[in-house]
Amino acid sequence: MATESGSDSQLRRRRRRDPEGSEKTELSEREPALAVAGSEENDDENEERWVGPLPVEATLAKKRKVLEFERVYLDNLPSASMYERSYMHRDVITHVVCTKTDFIITASHDGHVKFWKKIEEGIEFVKHFRSHLGVIESIAVSSEGALFCSVGDDKAMKVFDVVNFDMINMLKLGYFPGQCEWIYCPGDAISSVAASEKSTGKIFIYDGRGDNQPLHIFDKLHVSPLTQIRLNPVYKAVVSSDKSGMIEYWTGPPHEYKFPKNVNWEYKTDTDLYEFAKCKAYPTSICFSPDGKKIATIGSDRKVRIFRFLTGKLMRVFDESLSMFTELQQMRQQLPDMEFGRRMAVERELEKVDAVRLVNIVFDETGHFVLYGTMLGIKVINVETNRCVRILGKQENIRVMQLALFQGIAKKHRAAATIEMKASENPVLQNIQADPTIVCTSFKKNRFYMFTKREPEDTKTADSDRDVFNEKPSKEEVMAATQAEGPKRVSDSAIVHTSMGDIHIKLFPVECPKTVENFCVHSRNGYYNGHTFHRIIKGFMIQTGDPTGTGMGGESIWGGEFEDEFHSTLRHDRPYTLSMANAGSNTNGSQFFITVVPTPWLDNKHTVFGRVTKGMEVVQRISNVKVNPKTDKPYEDVSIINITVK
């Protein structure tokens, strides 16, 4: 029996090794047959040969899933770690969309809408509309990029022709709207648009080019206020969600507003669409892949879920909750502890003011990647391999909210490029390259930011500022500028007289005029006299400028706080750098610190406005005094006697 089982095992192994044709299989069957015949003649030899169980073949290691041509796809996505340009609105920007007709449309909290045109490199301003008298609740662009609409708390819907950048219709809704979406596809007779009532689950369908009379009303489809309405133009179906976590499929006028017939399910229990209701969450953003087969969502529980549209089955879940980020920071530090704490505070404020609902998710043109904003920056996730392949803007001091993705070549040429043109070495044709761009909004910012494949320092002129001031200053800003005394109030050098010696400082009034003015005026007025170095960290920095000595006090010469003044030539790249202390973005008061080592992680977070030119040994002596390990406060006070401004 041992011989037979051994022969069978050997035969099976030979068959696995020779998967080709039947001839090899027959040959491998003959060989063990001879071995059996020989073993009958010599049993002793056979017993020695087949003693014990045969070794099991090693199982093949599971191959890691790989997306073919992933590098090519990533080359068509923005890759710069910092934003290249930013442009302004008068108020906080809340919404941004990108159309297939190469337009970018931004909307701000004060009801204003701006149209921008994507050009070969960058964008250009087109037109400005005062769209609503109040807050804009939602905006939408049609699937072919021809029509744009916005709804606001003035109970109105405004409809725009995108290509001609003109307002073509205005609908008086008679209720406070919540969400809106174009639900028609190219070729439909009616340009239908859906709008939901903010406080109920009703959905009203209108003719976008018609009057105020609704074509249809869904009054029983949802029982809770809606959070999203999105059209899947490939399958001509609409998906809507409400605050109870329910997700519904329906169609527009061509299919008489019924359940779509082209999906592979009839009862919702056969799908995973109850996932949100089970988790007591609801979708705050929904988008479809270009082929219409995937639905990407962001939930109120900060989880990214990806479903298959036709079956409603859950495909992927990515946890982006604050507890996950805290655990990740503890396992492997993602950010300096001080910066991580600041960003966590911003995240909690997001939840407090219910701004998480403005964060959205988008697919790229291939449908293999999703992009969305997190506290670490813009994540690019490969949904096929389940990996985060890129993070943009990690070192930026902004919390990305809504984003829109442009891919391709903006400038349309008269004739399509042939294979011969593509293969040629014509330098003119080679200059026509794609300019993938992410346009995003930020929390509490009146700017939108553009991430491309170019870093800020790669721009044509080294002196060009990436933050473009395309809006006129407000009356308050003009008054503050005219009241300032100008050059008399600032200086380019000062001497800090401390109880341990003098520190000579060079100031930078040209690069950061407001910060230097604040320091000089405070110094001349004797504000810093008697202030202690209330926080000293050996091998890092010494901090002062707080009249209370607790680290919680101090204000600017204008009262309250003032904005950051970052400059590309002023970095924390060397010791003895003079920089402003703050409690977050644009919260400068009177406190400042002097570093004793290079601290590059503070760049673009704290304003550098001076360098120590003499008295470095005094700074070192102060940094080496004994301090309370819990509070970093010296046991014996080291104080500023006064500051002489030259």
Curated annotation (Swiss-Prot):
Q: Which UniProt keywords apply?
A: Acetylation, Isomerase, mRNA processing, mRNA splicing, Nucleus, Repeat, Rotamase, Spliceosome, WD repeat
Q: Where is the PPIase cyclophilin-type domain?
A: 490-645
Nucleus as UniProt keyword: yes
- State what inhibits or activates this protein: Inhibited by cyclosporin A (CsA).
Gene Ontology terms: cellular component: catalytic step 2 spliceosome; nuclear body
Concerning PANTHER family, the annotation shows: PEPTIDYL-PROLYL CIS-TRANS ISOMERASE-RELATED, PEPTIDYLPROLYL ISOMERASE DOMAIN AND WD REPEAT-CONTAINING PROTEIN 1
Q: What is this protein called?
A: Peptidylprolyl isomerase domain and WD repeat-containing protein 1
